[in-house]
Amino acid sequence: RDCCTPPKKCKDRRCKPLKCCA
């Protein structure tokens, strides 16, 4: 959840692999 909103968190290691960050 937190990884996708806001998308800025996609820079995080654990968030990067998520589809919402691709």
Curated annotation (Swiss-Prot):
Q: Which residues carry this modification: 4-hydroxyproline?
A: 6-7, 17
The free-text domain note is: The cysteine framework is III (CC-C-C-CC).
Identify the Pfam families for this entry.
Answer: Mu-conotoxin (PF05374)
Q: Does the keyword NAD apply?
A: no
Protein name (Swiss-Prot/TrEMBL): Mu-conotoxin GIIIC
- What organism does the UniProt record list as the source? Conus geographus
Where Alanine amide occurs, the residues are 22
Q: What is the lineage of its organism?
A: Eukaryota, Metazoa, Spiralia, Lophotrochozoa, Mollusca
Highest taxon above the source species: Eukaryota
Site feature Increases tethering of the N-terminus (compared to GIIIA), forming a more compact structure, where? 18
